[in-house]
Amino acid sequence: MKNYKWQEWDINHFKTLYPQLQADTTKELIHNRMGRLYWVWKDDALYVQRFARENGPYQGRNLKWLRKCLPNARTIVDVGMNVANNTMEYATWAETVHGFEPTPSTFALAEANVELNQHVELKGRYYNSQKVMSEHDPDHADGWYKFPDKTFASLTMSADVHLHNVGLGDVAGSFQMEDHPNNVGHNCILTEERKQKTKYEVYDVTVNTLDSYNFENVDAIKVDCEGYEYPILKGALQTIQRCRPVVQLEIVEAQCKKFGYTPQDMFDLFHKQVGNYVTTDFQGNDIGTDWQRIKGVMDRFFVPKEIYQKIPKDNSKVRHPGMERPQINEEIFEELFE
């Protein structure tokens, strides 16, 4: 694929580069206000709500805190990559990024998204919120991470990116997952009980342990796997002990319950088993060693003390345009997984 300069940005042309996806009526190519491009499922409205139009990167507040923790990240591992939305942003500042996604159809979109965005230069803003339409203004500086001098960090994907079409867990093997056609972010490995109840299509996936890859210089691990976070951590324990990365986990209590553990088990892994970690929210606040619900916050960051102590503290709540999100009622959210 040729490299496209910012003057050549044309979403209609980019669609033609992937004729199979373009012909698939269940897929569409969308973009956010910074020009980042995503092949997604057309019937999954959450993708447009989270990724497109006036939005910056999904969960930009988490990205900003992770980059603040690790301004010179060497290797970042993205577990539960989905369509590579986070993988692509990690690639703007890390040296190496590994993305893991077990669902074949999702993995295919992630591959296309990484390939396309690696070849497209971005400059300015690509969406006019006042006109509610796509419009490129190359002179309107934009991005999701600001340096102290108020300039935006580059959106160029400069990292060496490796994508893996497998799942991760505490043991290697073949597992079954269920496919949520209108919300693929909820695809998950099935417990024995769930296998008897699921109404969704079931498919087999290969699962390895993260430790089996023997990755070096792992500075960050992000895990968002619909309740399977703790088994993944257990299969990554040697890597965590050896590399002492910042670990970002999505934690929903009801999802943990499905797999027979509690959020506190993950807190104890870092604070009692590994040791010398600080648990924070996306603003860097130390939230202690015990699990507690925080309204509107689903991710927790486990940060090595030697890293946390060096981070300049700034608890500003100012957000860039498009990053505002309605507060999530986590109790209602969790009821969906009972």
Q: Model segments located where?
A:
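Short, conserved loop/helix-junction motifs that constitute active-site signature segments
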Residues: 90, 236-244, 270-273
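Short internal loop-to-helix segment that lines adenine-nucleotide cofactor pockets
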Residues: 54-75, 144-147, 176, 190-243, ...
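Polar, low-complexity loop segments and adjacent catalytic/binding residues used for recognizing
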Residues: 173-182
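Conserved Class I S-adenosyl-L-methionine
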Residues: 263-276
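S-adenosyl-L-methionine
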Residues: 1-158, 195-200, 215, 278-338
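Conserved acidic residues
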Residues: 167-170, 209
